[in-house]
Amino acid sequence: MGNNVFDVLKERGYIKQTTHEEEIRDLINKDKITFYIGFDPTADSLHIGHFLPLMMMAHMQKAGHRPIALVGGGTVRIGDPSGKSEMRKMLSKEAIDKNVSSIKSQISRFIDFSDDKAILVDNADWLLNLNYLEFIREIGVHFSVNKMLTAECFKQRLEKGLSFLEFNYMLMQAYDFLCLNRKYGCVMELGGDDQWSNMLAGTDLIRREESKSAYAMTCTLLTNSEGNKMGKTVNGALWLDKDKTSPYEFYQYWRNVDDADVEKCLALLTFLPMDEVRRLAALEGNKINEAKKVLAYEVTKLIHGEDEAKKAEEASEALFGAGKDMSNVPTVNISKDDLGKGILDILVETKILPSKGEARRLIQQGGLSINEEKVTDINMAVTEDLFEENSIIIRRGKKSYNRIVIE
């Protein structure tokens, strides 16, 4: 690779903080290193917030470095307090195992694990059977409680209450880095910027225990031009699993980003060359929509594959452009027995909306249409006369569409 990958990551806007910028630049330019990123399996899918670290990981792998993807099957039993205002609910072992399995398969879509090019580990393998006394003697001795209490991840929790369980999280994450350093020669941790305190603890532990240098580099959080987190939809998070967020809904999210966010999203969420990113971002007026189409297609292709990206693009064209093929618009089926039911029941039973409260609110705010006719009555019945060619088109907000078909 001609460019130093550090400069590539910097130019594209990934890097937020580093422990030793010049040392890291030299290290990843001149040597091939092993680095890791951790993913806690708190849900059965990764979401768009995890995608930036995954992209960072992919850029590093393309430059010849070896990634370790660590799934936190052990640490998730504690719960990371970073950025959380209250304690997370504890997950059952079965739920954790299911989540770990799903996340491992998702990571494999972005990272090449063939021929030892990358390693996938679960920290449950070394955390579950830790001897508490040995751990406290070997690891705990290096941690100053006074210093830990000044860490950003604990500050906001001290007033509301921080359990001893969660207070241990920093030690566990630092210990992960030490284990990976000892077993695989891992010298760098990458992660979200909310992990900075935990990552510094790991580099410090390796320095004290192994008398070696270790490094940390954080990834910027995905925010819009106003500084708000991106990736929220009416149905919650923007998931990478197509059963939780359909490829069409995913595509439409990026198709509808603000003009001011196009360049940032193209740089962070695609592999398009930066010259092309700048060219697309410089388009003005209606032409910026072409850049948004490219963004939506490229990101959807990376997450869901080329076929799903094409289908989502065609569905979008059918609804907003000159296309007439509605077959790729997200479609749900109802039976003739469902005819006559209320609109709220239909919307929830078909999973177009997550709850009747959400559906009621949307209608009251004037945000729901059937066949481009605004729905004003929350008690309206869905009857056969509404259907044209056996289907109706539901529009939520300005640009979220679903088709309902009678089986």
Curated annotation (Swiss-Prot):
A motif ('HIGH' region) lies at residues 41-50. It is an enzyme of class 6 (ligase). Keywords: Aminoacyl-tRNA synthetase, ATP-binding, Cytoplasm, Ligase, Nucleotide-binding, Protein biosynthesis, RNA-binding. GO terms for biological process: tyrosyl-tRNA aminoacylation. Coiled coil: none annotated. L-tyrosine binds at Y36, Y169, Q173. A motif ('KMSKS' region) lies at residues 229-233. One of its GO terms (molecular function) is tyrosine-tRNA ligase activity. It is found in: Cytoplasm. Transmembrane segments: none annotated. The keyword Cell membrane does not apply. It comes from the Bacteria. Its EC number is 6.1.1.1. One of its GO terms (cellular component) is cytosol. Its main location: cytoplasm. InterPro entries: aa-tRNA-synth_I_CS, aa-tRNA-synth_Ic, Rossmann-like_a/b/a_fold, S4_RNA-bd, S4_RNA-bd_sf, SYY-like_C, Tyr-tRNA-ligase, Tyr-tRNA-ligase_bac-type. Belongs to the class-I aminoacyl-tRNA synthetase family. TyrS type 1 subfamily. Homodimer. HAMAP family: Tyr_tRNA_synth_type1 (MF_02006). This is Tyrosine--tRNA ligase. It comes from Clostridium tetani (strain Massachusetts / E88). The gene is tyrS.
